[in-house]
């Protein structure tokens, strides 16, 4: 099974991914976590590009969307191996939905992002952790190119659109404590896996 945690920067994806992994392992599942961008050579280029001030320009967003699509293909075999195995779970901190929400601008249509990610495995379940932009900014350890209120607001709106248009996506309010949010994530996993 391939589970993805999504949401704007500062929402707590990394913390919740770690907590979910521990819980699933205690329940007898074999669990691996991954993060986007990956540690591949392509992922390293992406990380460097994300740090540049011009990273949010439309041209750079187009380039990043292509790089992310290529980076995701480095995970394709690994994801496909666990997708049909109920005892193995792969939890990803981000997926191609991040490209749809982050690289979505006036010059980049979501349809193009879907097209360049055509060969990327789709998650079995995506959980969008949702908080408002002000709370996200308070939680961010450091401010980077993508962590400004206007950009986070637009990105959050794009995530909320996905909840309405895509299958197997649920939204969880990430405002409460980490433990309350984790309980809600577990409830969604229990419901999906019919545990």
From Swiss-Prot:
Record key words, sorted: ATP-binding, Kinase, Nucleotide biosynthesis, Nucleotide-binding, Transferase
Any one Gene Ontology BP term: dTTP biosynthetic process
Catalytic activity: dTMP + ATP = dTDP + ADP
Known EC number: 2.7.4.9
Keyword Transferase: yes
UniProt keyword Nucleotide-binding present: yes
Binding site for ATP: 7-14
EC class: transferase
Superkingdom classification of source: Archaea
Signal sequence bounds: none
A single cellular component GO annotation: cytoplasm
Pfam families: Thymidylate_kin
NCBIfam families: DTMP_kinase
HAMAP family: Thymidylate_kinase
Family designation: Belongs to the thymidylate kinase family.
The protein's name in its UniProt record: Probable thymidylate kinase
Organism: Methanosphaera stadtmanae (strain ATCC 43021 / DSM 3091 / JCM 11832 / MCB-3)
Higher taxonomy: Archaea, Methanobacteriati, Methanobacteriota, Methanomada group, Methanobacteria
